[in-house]
Amino acid sequence: MPRLLPAILSSIISVALISAIASCAAPSKTKVSSGDMETFRASLENSDFTLKLAPFIHVDLIKLYEAGKLANAAGNNAGAPYKGVFGAIPENIEIKDINALSNAPEKIDSLLYGTPGLMQGWQLNPDEAIVLVAKTPPECAYFSYCGFIFYKYYEQEKQRKWVWTSFNDPLNNLTIKTSGTPNGAKGNPFNQDTIIIVTADKGTEQRIRSAAASAGYSADIINTYVIPSSMVKMGTGPEFDTIVFGHRMALFADEKAGQEYVNAVSAAIRVTPKSPVKLDPFPAPELRVRGTGKTEVDLQPALEDLRQAILAKHSNVSAKELETSVWLPESYDAVQRGLYVAGESRDTIYLRSDTFTLGDDTNEFIIVYGVNHAASGKATYANCSFYGEAGWNGVAGIYSTEYTGGAEQYLPGNPLAKYLYVCKFARSCDSEKTCVAVPTGPKAHGVGLDEPAFIGFRAYMEPSTKVGPCYTELLYDRVIKFNSR
């Protein structure tokens, strides 16, 4: 990857996470009722901080890949929306209210996709912070906020590498402090007021908290999201790391309300001390522990029965069983080895199949089957997506809410069938249930007939641990490629 160009940092658009859904609608304000935003800004300025607005917006990860802004599409979770924090509004645009920017979506879209060069992320000094004053999403199966090292500077090699590794556990709907879950208590975390302070420094965090209190915001809705300065090399210039911050959501109860939330243009505040301060860094955050000791192993015999039933049903065509393995290592492992993990989050697991191609013959298709990890209790939701190998572009997918019950036609009368699933990927599905049609385009929004592809799997957030399940407690999802003999 090319080195960062410090001279244009303020105008580079840097987004943590993004999705393969439509581009921005007209902006709408996201107001937080329990406090006064203008008073908060004034209080921050009176506390010897300078402020800079940063857009918090939805974009299309595959479109970024197509535009040459990313080297690949980062294994986007097909059908799941993401939002991200930008580096900043360019310095030549003076603005105090992001919604006062005329034609904001169009201008941001132009900056995001139209500027030359690869996206680089943005840099923070050790005493700076990013502050989000926001509404959480409307009701959905899952949401989270997460910070990442985008480019990591490795001293031994004297270069940056694109790693996209998380530096802290996600702040998710089971852990976030909001007006509906004050101080992290159980309650309703959806469509609630919240504040997130992203910083490495205790002193900066305390001053921001005091400013929020003076503006009428309750301490019960304030979340401190620690940047571990022992891991993230903070500062500005070519020998420092770049970071991004993003927001994941999945399976809205009301799709229209969810889409409005995703499309809304809101703002984060970059907070910078006006004068030097004595640094007081937070220690590295403790990570939530994966696993409960309870496994899915007792479902192994039923899973084998399902395998045999699938092979028998499609015995008129050739079958090739593909291996499933861990796709992405955890970020704390990857960053030590300089590995790219495409925005890996500890709230899920990442599995993938071997590569294959998928033509358009009616006898050529992919059958995916396994344990429904949501039904087994090991995940809040699970899903699988179809990816191009070259671009890691997720072009089609299916969720556990959609494939529930798919195994019962193969195992009639088996009481364990409800814990299993079967789905199909093909170029044409007609009216088949639990079948996903795989497009060939346009561009990277499809995968060509002869292009190498794979199936990627996720299982998000075990309810009892509030983090992703442990790999060794799951039975891996399986893939069979069928085609004419």
Show which residues each predicted segment covers.
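Bacterial N-terminal signal peptides that target proteins for export
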Residues: 1-12
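Bacterial Sec-dependent N-terminal signal peptides
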Residues: 17-35
